[in-house]
């Protein structure tokens, strides 16, 4: 498939590096069976934007230099996209709660 967005991090569904969007929800792919998502639309980082025209959240990460090694960034971006699609005017508390499951190995 040549998809490089989802990463294999912990393999336990704890770090968020493997995040994809399934049915509008941020979903940890490392603990999700293929059978449970068969026939579902699945969005990876590659499905959001392009190098020439990044998704607004991708652009915000670029503008704010919100990355170091980049390993965790796809999961963080997909988590943010799923949250803001569901709750466009999310409160700070909702954002913190949603992003809490994404661990950055460089900074934590």
What do the PLM-derived regions correspond to, one by one?
Residues 1-108:
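Signature of N-terminal electron-transfer/Fe-S-associated modules in redox systems
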